[in-house]
Amino acid sequence: MRKLLIVGGSILVVCLVLGLLTLRFIGYEPRDGSTGFWLTGAVVTTPVTDWSFTEAVEEIFVETRTWYYIPHSVNTYCTIYNDKLYLFSAYYQGGEFPDNRYWNRNVLRDPRVRLKIGNQLFERTVSHVTDEAEREAVHQTFVEKYTEWHTPGLETVHMFRVLP
């Protein structure tokens, strides 16, 4: 019986490792409100000084780093303010920041992210925006870009600035 448990457990571990390796190479992106793991695409290594191409993009993918080393990815909105790219996280049903958004907890712990815009991957660092004047201005650009969007109010909206 002990030998059967060891063999069965070993097979389970091998299957799990093979599954994770497969996901690592083929990726598993977020879909229809569900989260994903690794993002795939062409990595852009040159600095980006003009993010204006994102104005035509509704949603982007954000891959964050978890404490257990398996990436966590989500889709989110983005906008530009003063030539900088910003990411958006709204707490529509309330909840405490960052506890109700796993990706928010991840980027506060480790701000390195991968952004997928189209088929391109951008490895960047983000910074949580806390300055009220900047938050108000960025929030206004979100409202102008996403005209169908109904804001839950600035107090439940959180923004992250993408650093160069």
Language-model segments: what does each one mean?
Residues G19-L21, G41-F53, N75-S89:
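Charged, low-complexity, helix/coiled-coil-prone segments
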Residues V13, V62, L87, L115, ...:
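Generic structural hydrophobic/aromatic packing signal, biased to beta-strands
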Residues R24-P71:
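Short, conserved active-site entrance elements at the starts or edges of catalytic domains
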